[in-house]
């Protein structure tokens, strides 16, 4: 019997490594006569793994009766499809539900099952016979039994769907699972619930959910946080049930889960702990033109996965789109696919599953159509991306950065603070690692707090531990002083500011440290601070005032204000700064504290990240702007030695020589809405 495991950002079948680059093909939505020539096109693309759902409601032809061999309809012949994949030497990712969504009736479950939420006893009793039946049929195809199935997905994008199952979840007028969660969450302590909610309930059954955030009411924000925590609890309950059942039925290959891309409805790290791997589902608009911040969100999703996952992985990566979304996302170009894939690699992706590689009902703009014919422009782009992935081999790369940014899954699923800071990091082109406050301590020693004024006790203690162990925590404009229910909690003992000064009508130009100027629309003022005070001096405004008000504007020049402090704590340091977290300020802090920025473009719109393997460095760069751009990339002091370097474009194979001096000397040009990957090798070893 073979062993299948996940390690070193790959799946291993005994001693054979398998990189997770795959594509989705749905057998029951294609004419079986087209299976072979369609899969031949997939092979020509260079893909070696095929993923597929199996639809419960399609295979259950009568209650408790299943057709997996095509007796009632050739498209139901799951076994023939698995046999063909095996014959063609594809590895297989099997995704049998019970929910699959997949733009399919009822999301793939039967008409009877859909009446019940998936965490209910009724739903699970209906689902388990199908789960056992499909498992029994597919067991011989598991790689542990000499077959080709290497991963098994349990359910799909698990979600309580509170808008659909409101009453039965206890979110409306009567109690249910939500109240069961509260009893567990508050450890049967009704007084603790009443303190947190500022209520006087006589039983948990009286508690009602706040399922919409009202930001102006702190009490309701706290109650909303409990609603979001209920969602995470529910998802974990369902995931545990699904994974447990499949394992009981004999599945002994790694079990995977998928999740929405925003880290809100599901806690990714929890799902990976319940199973073996979790991946996000990412569907941006064409060339990031229709929704703001899409590239940043792709990169952030992979940065976060990089902090905890065995394989930073996209379980569903856009390849075509559901017909109802075409108006929202636009018609996809070859550049679109190159841009999003190189953006994912920049963020740290080590694998993905293209969904869908082949058109089918309700799904269009894939590189292969239902007849096995290709759309040449897209097919060629996918083939090029596959070759680039193989040449890069992201599974063996080491990310180069000394900077971390905190990540709270609870905050991310609720009020989502810290967005201005994350945007500023992106605009400054400063790469970083996320520090998951629910996970292990980061090994980075320079961390920025990207959160709001509330943070749970557990997470505040995590920050204190980080500082005590030698980390430098920087809070810009916001620091934790309350728990998740907006009750006072200041475990970091952060000095509160005494006032806020505005720079209306524009931003103030300020001198901070010795590294030039920063701008901020407001200042948080401090009178008495621990440690060393941080002082800014107002300079002449960068916005030229009208002539008649020039004298009034000049009155503020030279004024100095204490806007924070820095002090040692244990083996580390805490720095608190009452300014906007602008790109200029974040860069100035790196300079002041001698923290190198691994790679940084001098032109806006170009985003970079630096990785290394053995003695070589890999610069991944994208141009998200609408026009071609050239940029000089600066490398962190001391990272790349001065002298001659060989630069190879992994996509085109073009090779050139550059001379680096103090990290300067690398110029790149990128087409609009595209990217490139460069290998930098010391010239003497090339």
Model-identified regions with their sequence ranges:
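N-terminal carbohydrate-binding accessory modules
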Residues: 1-49
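Short, acidic/polar
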Residues: 29-44, 261-271, 334-341
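Carbohydrate-binding surfaces of carbohydrate-active enzymes
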Residues: 127, 131, 135, 147-150, ...
């Amino acid at each position: 019997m073979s062993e299948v495991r996940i390690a070193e950002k790959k799946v291993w079948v005994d001693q054979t490594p398998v990189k997770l680059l795959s594509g989705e093909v749905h057998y029951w939505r294609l004419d079986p006569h087209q299976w072979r020539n369609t899969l031949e096109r997939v092979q020509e693309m260079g893909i070696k793994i095929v993923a597929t759902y199996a639809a419960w409601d399609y295979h259950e032809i009568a209650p408790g009766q299943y057709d997996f061999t095509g007796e009632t309809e050739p498209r139901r012949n799951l076994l023939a499809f698995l046999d063909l994949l095996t014959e063609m030497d594809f590895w297989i990712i099997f995704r049998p539900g019970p929910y699959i969504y997949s733009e399919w009736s009822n999301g793939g479950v039967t008409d009877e099952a859909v009446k019940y939420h998936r965490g209910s006893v009724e739903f699970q009793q209906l689902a388990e016979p199908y789960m056992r039946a499909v498992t029994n049929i597919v067991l011989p195809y598991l790689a542990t039994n000499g077959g080709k199935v290497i991963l098994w997905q349990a359910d799909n994008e698990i979600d309580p769907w509170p808008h659909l199952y409101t009453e039965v979840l206890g979110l409306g007028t009567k109690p249910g699972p939500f109240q069961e969660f509260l009893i567990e969450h508050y450890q049967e302590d009704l007084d603790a619930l009443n303190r947190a909610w500022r209520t006087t309930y006589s039983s948990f059954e009286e508690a009602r959910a706040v399922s919409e955030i009202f930001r102006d009411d702190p009490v309701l924000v706290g109650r909303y946080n409990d609603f979001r925590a209920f969602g995470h609890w529910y998802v974990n309950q369902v995931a545990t049930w699904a994974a447990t059942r499949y394992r009981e039925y004999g599945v002994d290959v790694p079990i995977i889960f998928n999740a929405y891309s925003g880290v809100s409805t599901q806690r990714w790290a929890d799902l990976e702990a319940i199973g073996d791997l979790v991946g996000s589902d990412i569907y941006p608009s064409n060339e990031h033109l229709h929704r703001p911040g899409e590239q940043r969100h792709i990169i952030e999703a992979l940065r976060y996965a990089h902090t905890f996952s065995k394989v930073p992985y996209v379980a569903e990566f856009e390849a075509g789109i559901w017909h109802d979304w075409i108006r929202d996302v636009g018609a996809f170009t070859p550049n679109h696919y190159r841009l999003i894939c190189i953006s994912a690699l920049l963020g740290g992706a080590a694998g993905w599953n293209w969904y869908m590689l082949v058109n089918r009902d309700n799904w269009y703009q894939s590189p292969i159509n239902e007849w096995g014919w290709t759309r040449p422009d897209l097919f060629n782009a996918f083939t090029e991306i596959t070759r680039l992935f193989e040449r890069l081999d992201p599974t063996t790369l080491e990310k180069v950065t000394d900077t971390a940014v905190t990540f709270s899954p609870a905050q991310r699923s609720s009020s989502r603070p810290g967005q201005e800071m994350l945007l500023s990091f992106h605009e400054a082109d400063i790469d970083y690692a996320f520090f998951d406050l629910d996970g292990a301590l980061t090994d980075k020693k320079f961390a920025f707090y990207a959160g709001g004024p509330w943070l749970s006790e557990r997470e505040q203690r995590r920050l204190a531990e980080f500082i005590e162990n030698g980390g430098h925590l920087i809070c810009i404009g916001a620091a934790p002083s309350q728990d998740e229910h907006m009750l006072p909690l200041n475990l970091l003992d952060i000095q509160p500011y005494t006032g806020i000064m505005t720079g209306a009508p524009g931003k103030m130009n300020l001198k901070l440290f010795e590294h030039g100027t920063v701008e901020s629309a407001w200042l948080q003022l401090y009178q008495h601070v621990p440690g060393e005070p941080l002082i800014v001096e107002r300079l002449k405004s960068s916005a030229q005032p009208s002539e008649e008000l020039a004298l009034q504007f000049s009155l503020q020049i030279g004024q100095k204000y204490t806007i924070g402090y820095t002090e040692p704590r244990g083996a580390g340091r805490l720095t608190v700064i009452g300014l906007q977290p602008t790109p200029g300020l974040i860069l100035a802090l790196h300079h002041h504290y001698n923290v190198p920025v691994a790679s940084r473009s001098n032109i806006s719109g170009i985003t970079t990240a630096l990785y290394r393997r053995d003695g070589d460095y890999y610069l991944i760069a994208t141009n998200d702007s609408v026009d071609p751009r050239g940029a000089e990339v600066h490398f962190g002091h001391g990272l790349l030695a001065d002298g001659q370097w060989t630069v190879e474009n992994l996509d085109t194979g073009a090779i050139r020589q550059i001379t680096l001096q103090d990290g300067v000397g690398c110029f790149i040009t990128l087409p609009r809405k595209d990217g490139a990957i460069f290998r930098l090798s010391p010239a003497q070893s090339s």
